[in-house]
């Protein structure tokens, strides 16, 4: 008796990929804005939804929806822990973060501040923010509200673009200080680790938002161009004046705190209903990285965590700009002397304008 011939239509790997795609189509449905594919997961908690599969919103056809960077399965490795584990935040610390501005005192400060304002203007254009959605230009240092709120998709466009660039300064500064330490045959006194950790933290912000959406060709092109220009500009500026560069980054992080504060306000005011929904699920990688407790895993909670991180970068860079760039140790990684005359700086997130040199070095 002849055995019928069986045609293999796909490999085991393709079958696994197909199954993941089918699962994702059962949990999400799409929507599209400016080349950005958004996939926000909701889970049923209400009685009338308990029999239905989780729904969500994206911007492309369902069959194309997939994890933008799925974890690669290996025979032995279960997961890769973060190189710099997050120390975590208390609710009190996160709530106490406020938008603040350090007034320029020198020509270098003024130059750094004006460059940040130009970058803010360019970012508004690149991310499609309309005039009525921009904050009060008469109070650019503290304004966190606008005539018209952004949508969830617009916020994700802005977050992706900003965080793709925000991870550049720390890496550039850390790299140059590493090379400087090798050339001088001297220790760096703790600056390199803090700068690289800052860059890593910004990248984790980006990867978290990337779990919610996938950039299109236009966004990828904008990111490529912006990163190329920004990296080289930071490289040259840090060679010329590290002090002004750190001040620039401090002002840049001020803008980040303003941005996330505005997002929190719009969530609280009900302008972002998808993110206010109790069924909304933030990415699991965010829960693990920030060690977010049960009951504190909403989108607003996630933004609180990220804003606190940005507040740290704000305080750290303003402080580093106040120090002797070649000789002073990094005050945020050193143990301080106890007793009379000894000082221990408070959390940099709570020092918006940074510490003066006399407060941490003497």
From Swiss-Prot:
Gene: aod-1
Membrane topology (UniProt): Multi-pass membrane protein
Name by which UniProt lists this protein: Alternative oxidase, mitochondrial
Subcellular location: Mitochondrion inner membrane
Transit peptide: 1-64
GO terms, molecular function: alternative oxidase activity; metal ion binding
Keyword Iron: yes
Listed transmembrane segments: 156-176, 222-242
Binding positions for Fe cation 1 per the UniProt entry: 163, 202, 205, 310
Residue numbers binding Fe cation 2: 202, 253, 310, 313
Gene Ontology terms: cellular component: mitochondrial inner membrane
Family membership: Belongs to the alternative oxidase family.
